[in-house]
Amino acid sequence: MPTPLAWGPFSVTPFTFDQVYFLVTLACYLPAVVLLWRSWVMKPFKQWAACLHEFSHALGAWVTCNSVTSIEVHGDEGGLTRWKGNNVECGRHAVLPAGYMGSCFWGCLIVFSCCDPIFMQVVALLLCVALLICLLYAFIGQTEEAPDRLPLIILSLSFTIVIGGVATVCFFLPWHPLLEALMLWLGALNIVYATLDIYDDTVARTDERSDAYQYAKLWGPCCFAKCVGAIWLTASVFVLLTVTGWTWTWLARSEGEVNWHALLPGPIVLSLAVLLRIGLGFVGAGAGEEKPLLPDGGKDKRGFDEAKATDFLRSKVMGNV
């Protein structure tokens, strides 16, 4: 049985060290991501989250026996997934919600993988496989403009090298704390991305180009986009809380060694995020600009919904191909 943490003769907590590490690190990462969400620091990470978002759309097409012709991630944090096939009607019901719910799934899977070092390495390599598939489509996909290929190429290569490199080294060296810190950061990133994106696109406002709006149209006039968004958001939050609870319960069985230095990444990242946010606030105040946490209805600047709605309309026109 795992023993509670203790400091000298005094009992510090009834929890295991792995539970404390998980709670402290995730509790620091989540607000850090939110604080920096609209800053330039998060741009590559948001593009990575967008990459998994588009890959999830592709998974929805493949699951319904359709084919994907291209996957794109743009420099403005937007993306586009083109697909076609003989099961277009069935595909729409899977492809449209796959982006939002896929981001939630990836975030939950990454966080839950931290329960076990081997499982964590497997999930890290699975992420690399997804990135390599996106890289393949960056070269062979039916992209209309050559510059659209470059962001996805750079993104896929960079994150594959970092994630795959650390995961591979962990098979030979005891670098598991580093990989766990990295995976929890990526998991927190996808959790925030999934939650804020669903809320902003579907609940906070109604955009005819959003996935929720197009999905609501599949069910007729009695279904509203905000209702679809509320259902997706509720399901996303429920799954996130459930998986977090599973992870906490699983870590209660662990007997990992106490290493207080492993707790440093979370507080350090949060401290840097606060300082950077304050610094960016001063710069923005000096320039007379204030950037909101969520975009002010400007999803066309990021291209997410426009791309997906174009995808939907394209498949509607194509019919059976």
Where are each of the predicted segments found?
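Non-transmembrane, juxtamembrane loop and terminal tail segments
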Residues: 275, 282-321
